[in-house]
Amino acid sequence: MEEFLQLDDEEREDVIEYIDEISEEAFLEVMMARKKFVLVHAGIRNFDPKKELDEYDTEDFITEPADLDKTYYKNRTLVVGHVPTTELGGEGKIVKKNNNVAIDCGCGKGGQLGIYCLGNGSEMYV
């Protein structure tokens, strides 16, 4: 938030416009190799298994990290980022736990880029 407040008015408007544009894409449901995936930025705040994804607000997908000890879906895999896996016991590698896949390997903080293939579950690192 501090960085946002340091922007000039035009830059702040640009950020707000960008957020408005991506708000329609706060989550993505994908089917690959007969498996269903839900892709979100961070997690699903106030998760309710009876609630449809489009009933959540954009902020619900970007503000609260996923709890990998929790199984969000039994018939879908939740793929998340936002929190580097080094903070989740992943040693900078992709973490798979309870039908969740955490893919943020800390590339933005000097770690490596983790790539997860939805089709076959393989991992690659750059």
Residue ranges, per PLM feature:
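Acidic, His/Gly-enriched loop-helix segments that form or flank divalent-metal centers
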Residues: 1-102, 106-111, 122-125
